[in-house]
């Protein structure tokens, strides 16, 4: 029986949450800059 590696799963989960965090920061930065410059 070949079980998936839980460590690999954790790394993928961390990478996904990291990408979501970067996307959230990027969106907030765009909204903040448009709020400042208008």
From Swiss-Prot:
Domain of life assignment: Eukaryota
Q: Where in the cell is it found?
A: Plastid, Chloroplast thylakoid membrane
Record's GO cellular component, any one?
photosystem II reaction center
Report the membrane topology from the UniProt record.
Answer: Single-pass membrane protein
This protein's UniProt keywords: Chloroplast, Membrane, Photosynthesis, Photosystem II, Plastid, Reaction center, Thylakoid, Transmembrane, Transmembrane helix
Q: Where are the transmembrane segments?
A: 17-37
Classification via InterPro entries? PSII_PsbL, PSII_PsbL_sf
GO-annotated biological processes = photosynthesis
Subunit (UniProt)? PSII is composed of 1 copy each of membrane proteins PsbA, PsbB, PsbC, PsbD, PsbE, PsbF, PsbH, PsbI, PsbJ, PsbK, PsbL, PsbM, PsbT, PsbX, PsbY, PsbZ, Psb30/Ycf12, at least 3 peripheral proteins of the oxygen-evolving complex and a large number of cofactors. It forms dimeric complexes.
Its biological function? One of the components of the core complex of photosystem II (PSII). PSII is a light-driven water:plastoquinone oxidoreductase that uses light energy to abstract electrons from H(2)O, generating O(2) and a proton gradient subsequently used for ATP formation. It consists of a core antenna complex that captures photons, and an electron transfer chain that converts photonic excitation into a charge separation. This subunit is found at the monomer-monomer interface and is required for correct PSII assembly and/or dimerization.
Q: Which family does it belong to?
A: Belongs to the PsbL family.
Q: List the protein's name.
A: Photosystem II reaction center protein L
Species of the source:
Tupiella akineta (Green alga)
UniProt lineage? Eukaryota, Viridiplantae, Chlorophyta, Ulvophyceae, OUU clade
- Gene symbol here is psbL
